Amino acid sequence: LIGVVLTSGLASCSNDDSATSNDISEGDLLLQKVLASNVDNTINSTYKALADSTQMLYEQLATIRKASTTNGVTQNMVNDACTLFIGARANYERSEAFLMGAAADFSIDPHIDSWPLDLTALYNLLVKSPALVEALDGDDGATVANANLGQSLLGFHGIEFILFRDGIPRTASELNANGTDSYNKSGLDFSSCSGEYEMIYAYAVCGDLRNSVFRLETSWNENAPQVHIDIMNSMEWSYTLTSGNSYGYNMKNAGVAGSTYSSVKNAISAVLVGDG
């Protein structure tokens, strides 16, 4: 749709030679509407869905984490978490159509979607680094994960490894405190790793994932839920342009003084190439 409107908009602009430098051409007005629709109906709605789904996944992992301590993890708990993970992952893949703005400026994509997962590092964490795992189990576990784990252990793929095996949900008993991992490949034997430790890791990493997604959401939408904005402020994470404007406002006001886009067509171009 943007491509079609861009063609007609540019044609309209080229036929509007009488417009003065202080006027907005009819073509640019049309393109501004396209940009506003893209921000409101595509980018913001996608990030909202992603934020909601990662929050639900985080809450479900909290349930499993708590149940793990009493060896009470059920298969339904794990299956529900896997369903929520798939939904969150699908929302993220939809957002990859516009990895620009905040996603690029704050390096969020590599932070939450680096591949492959470093299984050797994960083994060393879960089997050989009990002090760090215990730090991940604190109230600020997501912050500890963000600061200490590195991109190869953060994001979707680390959580996926804990929840799934060979594309299907893990056996629930493996995620209990008295459970052990059945993974034993390529010289990495996770059987000495407790299910409780795995859930501590997954829950902390999911907290960091959720916070990173909240950063995407609040960066584009100045009307994002206040609780999400409060989390950004409490973590002292930047989530706006240096002007203080949201990325959505900045794009909607392309060509207007204060926007980083010098013209409407520059903003359209950024959308089409997914950059800027």
Identify the meaning behind each predicted range.
Residues 8-12:
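C-terminal motif of bacterial Sec signal peptides marking the signal peptidase cleavage site
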Residues 14-17:
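Bacterial signal peptide processing site
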Residues 1-5:
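Sec-dependent N-terminal signal peptides
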Residues 20-276:
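Mature extracytoplasmic or organellar-lumen-exposed domains after removal of signal/transit peptides
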